[in-house]
Amino acid sequence: MTTLKNDRFLRALLREPVDTTPIWMMRQAGRYLPEYRETRSKAGDFLSLCKNTEFACEVTLQPLRRYDLDAAILFSDILTIPDALGLGLYFETGEGPKFHKTVRTEQDVANLPKLNAKADLDYVMNAVSTIRSALGGQVPLIGFSGSPWTLATYMVEGGSSKEFRFTKQMMYAQPEVLHALLDHLADSVIDYLNAQIDAGAQAIQIFDSWGGALAHREYVEFSLNYMNKIIAGLQREKDGRRIPVIVFTKGGGQWLEPMIASGADALGLDWTTPLNTARNVVSGRVALQGNLDPAVLYGSAASIEKAVKAMLDDAYANGEKTGYVANLGHGITQWVDPAQPKIFVDTVHEYSAKYLG
């Protein structure tokens, strides 16, 4: 394998010394970039973009050409697993993802096939290996999956939801059915992420996008427990290097203590949890990642710089000099001016020298 030229992202996740704060951005390959929109137009639709190795590689690399990022993240979708399980993923303009089939009964769960990620999601593995090769050791490649709870919400609801009516109905009225579904999904995610690691992913992020919709006990029982199972089942070393794992529960800042016990190397934060507070809670036991409000990127250069510096001041307030990766608190939005993320990235690298130099 090609020697990694810039490994500060991996080192920060493992709480090893770094020369400057590493940064990447959730959804860094996306609709805010004109070159992404052009490539998507060539592909014809979003799913075709994900399933074409050449296009998926191209859009993964696009933000790295514009910004001095410290990691690339596989361009794909969190709903590849439910699609491979036969639910029939499709997208309607302005309405987000939908499925032709839902999973709402014990029989529906029993009918789900066992996932063979290398065969059933070979297009993802082809993309990972192609991107890893194209990066040439420039920066590490992040692989990812949705959490079982988050995947289950889409499968039970039949698409996006704000209230999670059917999923929560299952949770309270038929918890054994939901547990069976979540267990099946945890096994699927383990297989999927290990296949990504075999294909070349050098770090893993689990996106628990809807974990924050749960109450405390339900979060632990129906979301965190299954992420714990996944982490325990992952390869943690490849080619002589540890494969760090990041858990990101949007709206999960109040659950840092139980998340620390998950076995993850790092916890992602959204913008509702102050970094200095989180640093004090974790006390160096895990790294942290985050947590600029993506809306900050709508502002002027001066306002972006001010917000980024305040974020870094919080991150290093307790004197720790590593164990931190800068990021947004959620995905970058399609309305951001492509010039603005450069201010974010460059300010992180330049200002963090004050603490790390």
Curated annotation (Swiss-Prot):
Where does it reside? Cytoplasm
This protein's pathway reads: Porphyrin-containing compound metabolism; protoporphyrin-IX biosynthesis; coproporphyrinogen-III from 5-aminolevulinate: step 4/4
User: Cross-referenced InterPro entries, in alphabetical order?
Assistant: UROD/MetE-like_sf (IPR038071), Uroporphyrinogen_deCO2ase_HemE (IPR006361), Uroporphyrinogen_deCOase (IPR000257)
Q: Give the Enzyme Commission number.
A: 4.1.1.37
Highest taxon, organism lineage = Bacteria
Q: Does the keyword Iron apply?
A: no
Presence of keyword Amino-acid biosynthesis: no
One GO term in the molecular function aspect is:
uroporphyrinogen decarboxylase activity
- Biological process annotations from GO: protoporphyrinogen IX biosynthetic process from glutamate
Listed under GO cellular component are: cytosol
Catalysed transformations (reactions): uroporphyrinogen III + 4 H(+) = coproporphyrinogen III + 4 CO2
Gene3D superfamilies referenced in this protein's UniProt entry, alphabetically = 3.20.20.210
Family, per the entry?
Belongs to the uroporphyrinogen decarboxylase family.
- Role description: Catalyzes the decarboxylation of four acetate groups of uroporphyrinogen-III to yield coproporphyrinogen-III.
Describe its partners and assembly state.
Homodimer.
* Record protein name field: Uroporphyrinogen decarboxylase
Q: Which organism is it from?
A: Acinetobacter baumannii (strain ACICU)
Query: Taxonomic lineage per UniProt?
Result: Bacteria, Pseudomonadati, Pseudomonadota, Gammaproteobacteria, Moraxellales
